[in-house]
From Swiss-Prot:
The lineage of its organism: Eukaryota, Metazoa, Chordata, Craniata, Vertebrata. It is a multi-pass membrane protein. This is NADH-ubiquinone oxidoreductase chain 4. The chain crosses the membrane at residues 21-43, 58-78, 93-112, 116-138, 145-165, 196-216, 224-244, 257-277, 285-305, 309-329, 341-361, 379-399. Keywords: Electron transport, Membrane, Mitochondrion, NAD, Respiratory chain, Translocase, Transmembrane, Transmembrane helix, Transport, Ubiquinone. It comes from Struthio camelus (Common ostrich). It is an enzyme of class 7 (translocase). One of its GO terms (biological process) is electron transport coupled proton transport. One of its GO terms (molecular function) is ubiquinone binding. It catalyses: a ubiquinone + NADH + 5 H(+)(in) = a ubiquinol + NAD(+) + 4 H(+)(out). Belongs to the complex I subunit 4 family. It is found in: Mitochondrion membrane. It holds the Pfam family Proton_antipo_M. Core subunit of the mitochondrial membrane respiratory chain NADH dehydrogenase (Complex I) that is believed to belong to the minimal assembly required for catalysis. Complex I functions in the transfer of electrons from NADH to the respiratory chain. The immediate electron acceptor for the enzyme is believed to be ubiquinone.
Length: 458
């Protein structure tokens, strides 16, 4: 554990002390090295927890998410180079330091076996994210987006803190493996239900559940590219991971606790997919598609079967890589045309032919084309939900159909059609961008060959 966390923390002096010429090279290479070392966590184990320290441990649910979080840091640095070109050196260093600060907190959140540490690191990721959005966002609305993010997250996580403290007074320990043996909140009383609700609510907002998702499109649209990648690929996964952890703690959920969440998640997957079909803003479209995918993850986590957990895990990892790649592609368009409106950025295929190949690949993985891991995840979740209740096949089937529709809509709008007249000169795509897309799609292609690495078998 420490052999990843300590090098990650040492990225801070690297960013602060590197000379101007080699600042990006040093930090990106160093973080790629950390990402490569973290791949050993995927090594299958016969023990439920490995690398155990008194506070942290890795099992098959957290290992894939930990590797994903290490893998994305160099990609965020690669993606941010262009839009920070005009900034003074001090601000570049500050930006890299802010990005790097989030990393140890995310690693701790995914590997904590102690609920207090989990809560602290879960909340600590909020501060650097807020700085990223409110300082490096593009429009003045970024302040409103930051306030939405802050208040949604804080209001939902205060009951979580109270319940964690209540658990500690009730049982005397907050060690997760111990709590899993006791199932502390199994009462059918209203207090038990309220405690369960308080535990779940913080993660439902983070995931986000439909109805509690209003902060997400705002935050995504206003954030810089690194902020969007961070939100889509890692912070939403913190919500999904928290739900899986907490539902394991609570044992079988009562009907009155799980039904509303299940109904909202599945209905939300349908509604947000429909919203995507009439979006004009590219980043907003990708943000709503994230809500739709995470709705399936929430629904799967709520029914608490091995198959559903496995499907939720695969979907979280696949969606992390896919949506991050889509945001990078949207950003490459934005940097050239200075617009996110789909009507103003259409018909780019003749001008950027190689980029349109990446667009095609990203969209095909997003709409769950076989044999991608997205398809395996969606099928597993659909089967688990169908097994739990037959009518859910209508909702999941429609959601899948709408996903394919809005993905093709996004592809045709950005790549096809006549080129708008105001686009007179567009820079060619460069090697850095192609490397960035390759590093997104390469893990996806490799995971197709061995999806059990991320299937999180409990």
């Amino acid at each position: 554990m420490l052999k990843i966390i300590i090098p990650t923390i040492m990225l801070l002096p690297t960013a602060l002390l590197s000379p101007k010429a080699s600042l990006w090279t040093n930090t990106t290479t160093y973080s790629l090295l950390i990402a490569t070392i973290s791949l050993q966590w995927l090594n299958p184990t016969y023990f439920p927890h490995k690398n155990m320290t008194p506070w942290t441990g890795i099992d098959q649910i957290s290992a894939p998410l930990l590797v994903l979080s290490c893998w994305l840091l160099p990609l965020m640095l690669l993606a941010s180079q262009n839009h920070l070109q005009q900034e003074p050196l001090v601000r570049k260093r500050t930006f890299i330091v802010t990005l790097t600060t989030i990393q140890p907190f995310i690693i701790l959140a995914f590997s904590a076996t102690e609920l207090t540490l989990f809560y602290i690191s879960f909340e600590a990721t909020l501060i650097p994210t807020l700085i990223l959005i409110t300082r490096w966002g593009n429009q003045p609305e970024r302040l409103s987006a930051g306030i939405y993010l802050l208040f949604y997250t804080l209001i939902s996580s205060l009951p979580l803190l109270v319940t964690i403290l209540h658990l500690h007074t009730q049982i005397g320990t907050l060690h997760m493996p111990t709590l899993e043996l006791t199932h502390p909140l199994l009462t059918h009383s209203w207090t038990g239900t309220l405690s369960g609700l308080a535990l779940l609510m913080a993660f439902m907002v983070k995931a986000p559940l439909y109805g509690l998702h209003l902060w997400l499109p705002k935050a995504h649209v206003e954030a810089p590219i690194a902020g969007s990648m961070l939100l889509a690929a890692l912070l939403l996964k913190l919500g999904g991971y928290g739900i899986m952890r907490v539902t394991l703690l609570m044992g079988p959920l009562t009907d009155r606790l799980s039904y509303p969440f299940l109904a909202l998640a599945l209905w939300g997957a349908l509604m947000t997919s429909s919203i995507c079909l009439r979006q004009t803003d590219l980043k907003s479209l990708i943000a709503y598609s994230s809500v739709s995918h995470m709705g399936l993850v929430i629904a799967a986590s709520m029914i608490q079967t091995d198959w559903s957990f496995s499907g939720a895990m695969i979907l979280m990892i696949s969606h992390g890589l896919t949506s991050s790649m889509l945001f990078c592609l949207a950003n490459t368009n934005y940097e050239r045309t200075h617009s996110r409106i789909l009507l103003l950025t259409r018909g780019l295929q003749p001008l950027l032919p190689l980029m349109s190949v990446w667009w095609l690949l990203a969209n095909l993985t997003n709409m769950a084309l076989p044999p991608t891991t997205n398809l395996m995840a969606e099928l597993t979740i659909m089967i688990a939900l169908f097994n739990w209740s037959t009518p859910t096949i209508i909702l999941t089937g429609l959601a899948t159909l709408l996903t394919a529709s809005y993905t093709l809509f996004m592809l045709s709008m950005t790549q096809r059609g006549t080129l708008p007249t105001h686009l007179t000169s567009i820079h060619n795509s460069n090697t850095r961008e192609h490397l960035l897309m390759t590093l997104h799609i390469f893990p996806m292609l490799l995971l197709m060959l061995k999806p059990e690495l991320i299937s999180g078998v409990i």
